[in-house]
Amino acid sequence: MHNILEVIYWNKCSYERKKKILSRPIISNRFLIRNKVKEIISNVKSFGDRALYNYTNVFDNINLKNIRVSEEDIVSSHLHVSKELKLAVEVAFKNIKKFHSKQNVGSFNLKVQDNIYCQQIIRPIESIGLYIPNGSAPLLSTVLMLAIPANIAGCKRIMLCSPPPIMNEILYACKICEIKDVFQIGGAQAIAALGCGTETI
């Protein structure tokens, strides 16, 4: 049996019907979601890593022994991806780096008139967190587009979270971008951990 899509004639729809068509399920549940996210953030603040392991078990149905991805797994990721993917990542890396390098204007001093100077000081954010969603396809381009500017800016610590299990393509992009702090955590709990810190993050 074939599924036939409903044809909607917008001009013939009532205001209420249009509103219903345009509404998203997530928006209709926004208060419920907001309260759940607040609870998750509160638990991550209070219980740290324990909350992360618990939420990974509940939401991702995975019982992790370690939320941190080992350096060995990151380094060996190239063994588990195709030559075509490696080539595509290398080309994308060079292009993205070339573009963002032009944005790095740096600090400067400017004499605007006698005894009056203006200065621009550029300082990188010391520690940053990147979140890479997990879906039907690995979003390794997101790793490149977030990590390359952070590296160019001179951020000293770059952490990355992605829901478990993290795909080898993502780990390979982490390797190329020299990201060493990679964690198997997804959702609001990952954002809370990056923002508030835990024993591991």
Curated annotation (Swiss-Prot):
Belongs to the histidinol dehydrogenase family. Keywords: Amino-acid biosynthesis, Histidine biosynthesis, Metal-binding, NAD, Oxidoreductase, Zinc. Coiled coil: none annotated. GO terms for biological process: L-histidine biosynthetic process. Its cofactor is Zn(2+). It comes from Buchnera aphidicola subsp. Schlechtendalia chinensis. This is Histidinol dehydrogenase. It is an enzyme of class 1 (oxidoreductase). GO terms for molecular function: histidinol dehydrogenase activity; metal ion binding; NAD binding. PANTHER family: HISTIDINE BIOSYNTHESIS TRIFUNCTIONAL PROTEIN (PTHR21256:SF2), HISTIDINOL DEHYDROGENASE HDH (PTHR21256). The lineage of its organism: Bacteria, Pseudomonadati, Pseudomonadota, Gammaproteobacteria, Enterobacterales.
